[in-house]
Curated annotation (Swiss-Prot):
The keyword Acetylation does not apply. The lineage of its organism: Bacteria, Bacillati, Bacillota, Bacilli, Lactobacillales. One of its GO terms (molecular function) is phospho-N-acetylmuramoyl-pentapeptide-transferase activity. This is Phospho-N-acetylmuramoyl-pentapeptide-transferase. Pathway: Cell wall biogenesis; peptidoglycan biosynthesis. It is a multi-pass membrane protein. One of its GO terms (biological process) is cell division. It comes from Streptococcus mutans serotype c (strain ATCC 700610 / UA159).
Amino acid sequence: MLTTTIIAGIISFILTILAMPFFIRFYQLKKINGQQMHEDVKQHLAKAGTPTMGGTVFLLVAALVTFICAFVLHITGGPAFGATLAILFIVLIYGTIGFLDDFLKIFKKINQGLTAWQKMALQLIGGLVFYLVHVKPSGTDSLNLFGFPLHLGVFYIIFILFWVVGFSNAVNLTDGIDGLASISVVISLLTYSVIAYVQNQFDVLLIIISMVGALLGFFVYNHKPAKVFMGDVGSLALGAMLAAISITLRQEWTLLIIGIVYVLETASVMLQVSYFKWTKKRKGEGQRIFRMTPFHHHLELGGLRLRESGKKWSEWQVDFFLWSIGLLGSLLILAILYL
């Protein structure tokens, strides 16, 4: 089982590396207008036109490798892979939502893609189906908090929807500079691979390692200067995948710390908007806490200082800083669980 899982990761890595140049070349040959830039970070303007929707490639590779390996293992006497298929299902559902959003922006020239309400409705439907086909049959209606069950009853459905939709959008916000989201998710997935291994949930481990391999292959083309971006098709799917894995492993709360980067990025946006509206109402003029949100843009424009102007950070500096925070959060969780 473990050997097959490792092989799956290696195959995903190789296939993604081999397939991505054809995807990029397709963009160039068809003269498709890629990523649009409407940001105040001037150094990002040079990225306009970079091929996007690269998540289509690594999602399909990871899904194909996972499905084939799960099928082969099952017919050769291995366990059932219900959890694998459930997680794969929500990955593809959210990937499809992201694909539709990207497609409308890039090919139909609809700047906003799906409206916020359309996207939210589709995400909620995807989360609800995941609950009905995977969570509800298990009879679970409680959160596992340090080994103690917190029974939520009917509110557990609301939690599932909030968790999946919330982290899907959180990873989407994180995907704002070259390589940040891809390696942040790799760190999170590797942490959950340890938890899955300890729990002997090799069905979950299989899809985790397959996706890690595909993401590392994608990073070869996504690190600065990026030759391709993952797009909403990739980021929405990855966020939903992390939420689904945490639910399946009964370690939901750990995602708040393992995914501290996504939480920080989302919190910065919420704080910025709330504070701006509050100060505008109180003082007649909106004020900001951060130079720009999500948080990675704040770092780019002047480092950690809030209102004072500091030295601008390069994308690599921002990447390594936030990757380090994600790694520390992951190590903290493993220490809490197993030391």
